[in-house]
Each structure stands twice: as C-alpha cells, then as structure tokens.
Amino acid sequence: ADYLQLAR
C-alpha cells in the first residue's frame, strides 16, 4: 500500500 497517498 502507498502510505503517502493514504495520508491525503
């Protein structure tokens, strides 16, 4: 998973 994008 992409945590940087989930943080949006």
Swiss-Prot record:
GO biological process, alphabetically ordered: neuropeptide signaling pathway
Cell compartments where the protein resides: Secreted
Modified residues (Arginine amide): R8
Keywords in alphabetical order: Amidation, Neuropeptide, Secreted
Signal peptide, first to last residue: none
Main subcellular location: secreted
Domain of life: Eukaryota
GO cellular component, one term: extracellular region
Task of the protein: FMRFamides and FMRFamide-like peptides are neuropeptides.
Family to which this protein belongs: Belongs to the FARP (FMRF amide related peptide) family.
Name of protein: Extended FMRFamide-2
